[in-house]
Amino acid sequence: RQLEIDGYFSEAFGFWCVDADHIEGNVKDIELEMLLTIRKKNLWPISEYASSYTEDDFLDVIEFLYQYVSKPIDGTMHSYNGCGMHWETFNKKDGQNLFREKINAVLEHYKNKFELSQNGEVLHKPEEGFEQIFNADVPSKDSNIVGRVDAATTNFRRHGSSLDDRRQAVRDLADVLEYLR
């Protein structure tokens, strides 16, 4: 909620002005955008539906918000009736970095260990001692091999991945290793 108050979602979702009511952002219909992106209903507004979120809903909403957060840089102060800042310039990368930092601090305390990746995907956090396996450099400069290893690793760690998804990720890694052999 604090990021919303600080204007981090103003560029995408708009903001409230005492003179003009709701000023639209880049996303005109947030509920529709969530439906098209996540393919689920009854997620927006968050304040209305959050109490009924499943774990997957919660993590999907985090990924959705990551795509739309941006740090407010410059704007004009609308002082009439305490309206506040009307942000006009934003930095998406800085906003995403701060969002990721704050979300990962929350996810650190969640019952199942997850982390928000630099790509905006919520992934299972590796168990203690296994971090090096997931962070190791791929022993190849071939972008196709690196891409396949990264995709398999992400598919294995992805929130909501089924046992079959994980099996397929292991098979994909085995195929790469066989090729490298």
Feature-to-residue mapping (PLM):
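Charged interaction/catalytic cores of defense and host-pathogen modules
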Residues: 1-101
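Short secondary-structure junctions and interdomain/linker hinges
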Residues: 6, 10, 69-72, 110-114, ...
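Generic preference for hydrophobic/aromatic residues in regular secondary structure cores
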Residues: 9-15, 32-40, 116, 121-122, ...
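Residue-level signal for well-ordered alpha-helical segments
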Residues: 38-46, 50-53, 125-129, 133, ...
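Generic structural concept
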Residues: 59, 100, 104-107, 170-177
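Helix-loop junctions and short alpha-helical segments
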Residues: 63-148
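Amphipathic, oligomerization/interface secondary-structure segments
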Residues: 131-181
